[in-house]
Curated annotation (Swiss-Prot):
Function: Catalyzes the reversible isomerization of glucose-6-phosphate to fructose-6-phosphate.
Protein name (Swiss-Prot/TrEMBL): Glucose-6-phosphate isomerase
Organism: Shewanella amazonensis (strain ATCC BAA-1098 / SB2B)
Reactions it catalyzes: alpha-D-glucose 6-phosphate = beta-D-fructose 6-phosphate
Active site residues per record: E351 (proton donor), H382, K510
């Protein structure tokens, strides 16, 4: 056993996991269960009563958090300590939404003034674009933004921009390109006019393969329209740490926005990477997004463990992953605007906690990051919810829904809510054989047929879920929701004693991909790799199977 699993706290939880009653019984014997196991914070409401926990189990989970020194680790992150030890970096995405009078130091320097100076620069940039002051090379105002990035510099801005569609100013269209597959870029370029398009390139190094390839092709397309190299400065801006490469490309240094190495890509939407969000919803709404996240930061750092929303959600995930062998976790958004969140949370959690080495390099002997997946309610109810209800795997679920719709049309929203709440009840309650048999009592089936069909209609229930509600989807509540999942992810990493802020698996893929690229473009047949890779490379060169 590792030092994580060989603790009294861990062993106590293991013991509790083997003797819990069904949730039906837990609700039947405690009429106050919902009141005891629900929580409001930062414009969000969490009902975690439909989980396989008792007050005793929760107490043991909080003891596990104390044993892992969770509160000290939280404080260390917010203080700017080097908690990303493998890359020797602070982890300070939280500083990007800190108030302007905060003091957060990296290497003895307060980074908050630079953060707010960048916000002011973003505000001026947004104003010049949306007011029509910024003009393209033919004198026309900008109408379209093409944001080129990959990973966190793509997914975060795209999902947030999509979620905040009710707050779009209507002055611009925004298109996102990430995949190096040319089709992604080509199809977007069909929608825009080079005279009125601004390209925003986001890459810390200005050398990320996919992003640079797409940006170079976008520039070629732009120049083929009749523009000159000097005109590039009027149609390209960048978010990067490499100012020299950006200016060599043709971008005006005034339109280069900074990135810092103490912000990981999957946490970067709060930085200038979020520029597309600000362009689409305006600075007031963008600042409200930051304020919502800041409110969750304040809750996370100040609330006691037993009243701390990210802590509770993170510990519940550990509970199921390590004591019930849950290998995946589903996120179900009952709001069309939030349909992209499962993919965003997938990247956040799986890139952060998909690790097999502990902080000291010891190999873990327990499960770490689960597979995060999900989709939009009610669509999923006619597809994969079948697996949730009657499959053999335990899959904890998060249901997310605003109480008020931005589009209150007829009975749509009340039906949506009834489905959301009905699903959580069905997962918890299930259906017994006796209940299924009673439902068939009035049918014309024989007794044997009734018995057979009843067995097929049995649902074990006892399937755990959280329900997250908000009054209405706003920039502030969205900011709080995303920060909630950020901190939930961190809590899990602390319990497991892993580094949630590096991504060496991603780096290996890049390295090997570059090696294969060199072989794909070489003249001779591939022979230096394994037989499968060699054969695939040679097939690609031939262009046919």
């Amino acid at each position: 056993m590792s030092r994580v699993t060989n603790t009294p706290e861990w062993q106590k939880l293991k013991e509790y996991s083997n003797k819990l009653p069904h949730m039906r019984e837990l609700f039947a014997t405690d009429s106050a269960r919902f009141d005891k196991m629900s929580l409001k914070a930062c414009g969000l409401f969490l009902d975690y009563s439909k989980n396989r926990v008792t007050e005793v189990v929760l107490g043991a989970l909080f003891d596990l958090a104390k044993q892992a020194q969770l509160e000290a680790r939280i404080n260390a992150m917010f203080a700017g300590d080097i908690i990303n030890t493998t890359e020797k970096r602070a982890v300070l995405h939280t500083a990007l939404r800190a108030p302007n009078d905060a003091v957060v130091e990296v290497d003895g320097v307060n980074v908050v003034p630079e953060v707010h100076a960048t916000l002011d620069k973003i505000e001026s940039f947004v104003a010049s674009i949306t007011s029509g002051e910024w003009r393209g090379y033919t004198g026309k105002a900008i109408t379209d933004i093409v944001s080129i990035g990959i990973g966190g510099s793509f997914l975060g801005p795209k999902i947030v921009t999509q979620a905040l569609r009710p707050y779009w100013t209507g002055k611009l269209n925004c298109h996102f390109v990430a995949n190096v597959d040319a089709t992604s870029l080509v199809e977007k370029l069909k929608l825009v006019d080079p005279e009125t398009t601004l390209f925003l390139m986001s890459s810390k190094s200005f050398g990320t393969q996919e992003t640079l390839t797409n940006t170079l092709s976008a520039r070629d397309w732009f120049l083929q329209s009749g523009a000159s190299q000097a005109d590039v400065a009027k149609h390209f801006a960048a978010v990067t740490s490499n100012v020299a490469k950006a200016t060599d490309f043709g971008i005006d240094e005034a339109n280069v926005f900074p990135m810092w190495d103490w912000v990981g890509g999957r946490y970067s939407l709060w930085s200038a990477i979020g520029l597309p969000i600000a362009l689409m919803v305006g600075m007031d709404n963008y600042r409200a997004l930051l304020a919502g996240a800041r409110s969750m930061d304040e809750h996370f750092t100040s609330a006691p463990l037993a009243e701390n929303m990210p802590v509770i959600m993170g510990l519940l995930s550990v509970w199921y992953g390590n004591f019930f062998n849950a290998q995946s976790h589903v996120v179900l958004t009952y709001d069309h605007y939030l349909r992209g969140l499962p993919a965003y949370f997938q990247q956040l959690d799986m890139e952060s906690n998909g690790k097999s080495a502990m902080m000291d390099g010891e190999t873990v002997d327990f499960s770490t990051g689960p597979v995060i997946w999900g989709g939009e309610g009610t669509n999923g109810q006619h597809a994969y919810h079948q697996l949730l209800h009657q499959g053999t795997a335990l899959i904890p679920a998060d249901f997310i829904m605003p109480l008020q719709s931005h589009n209150p049309l007829g009975e749509h929203h009340v039906q949506l809510a009834s489905n959301c709440f009905g699903q959580t009840q069905a997962l918890m309650q299930g259906r017994t054989y006796e209940e299924a048999l009673a439902e068939l009592a009035a049918s014309n089936l024989s007794d044997d047929e009734k018995s057979l069909i009843a067995r097929h209609k049995v649902m074990e229930g006892n399937k755990p879920s959280n329900t997250l509600l908000m009054d209405k989807l706003t920039p502030s509540t969205l900011g709080a929701l995303i920060a909630l999942y950020e901190h939930r992810t961190f809590v899990q990493g602390v319990i497991w004693d892993i580094n949630s802020f590096d991504q060496w698996g991603v780096e290996l893929g890049k390295t090997l991909g570059n090696d294969v690229l060199a072989r794909l473009t070489a003249d001779e047949d591939a022979s230096a790799l394994d037989s499968s890779s060699n054969a695939l490379i040679n097939l690609f060169r031939k262009g046919q199977i």
